[in-house]
């Protein structure tokens, strides 16, 4: 019996900023109590390496399971932890505070690798107006 593996990856898509996002431009997420938040980790990983990582790479690396491994983890150990992590469905980048709170849209290229763009940037507007790119909204912070 083969284990089901879930994915958060999407190709050629834009996660648009949530309708109730308070930011009118891209804001850099800040640490909380001197410690990085998931949003600060996601921001640094994607902003510093645009189109290098997939959504799955970012979601796993910034999860508690991914952070617990550390850099010294063997590739086989990392792969096993990743398979276990994705054996259940995981929240995709639509649920990230980047698009819900901080004003960043997430674009994925045809290979599913991601980059972020400020909501007020020309690149974001270009992607948002492109009918060839699948458009999805970041999840709202509040119901209703």
Predicted region positions:
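Amphipathic protein-protein interaction modules
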Residues: 59-124
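Acidic-enriched, low-complexity/disordered segments with a strong bias for Aspartate over Glutamate
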Residues: 19-20, 56-57, 109, 120, ...
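A recognition module on extended beta-rich or small alphabeta surfaces enriched in W/G with H and D/E
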Residues: 129-144
């Amino acid at each position: 019996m083969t284990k089901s593996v879930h994915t958060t990856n999407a190709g050629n898509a834009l996660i648009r900023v949530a309708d109730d996002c308070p930011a009118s431009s891209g804001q850099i997420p800040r640490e909380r109590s001197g410690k990085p938040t998931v949003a600060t980790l996601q921001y640094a990983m994607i902003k510093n390496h645009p189109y290098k990582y997939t959504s799955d790479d970012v979601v796993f690396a910034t999860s508690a399971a991914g952070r617990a491994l550390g850099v010294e983890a063997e590739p086989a150990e990392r792969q096993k932890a990743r398979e276990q992590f994705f054996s259940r469905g995981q929240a995709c980048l639509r649920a990230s505070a980047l698009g819900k709170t901080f004003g960043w849209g997430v674009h994925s290229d045809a290979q599913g690798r991601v980059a972020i763009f400020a909501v007020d940037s020309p690149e974001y507007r270009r992607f948002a107006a492109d009918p060839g790119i699948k458009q999805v909204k970041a999840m709202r912070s509040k119901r209703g």
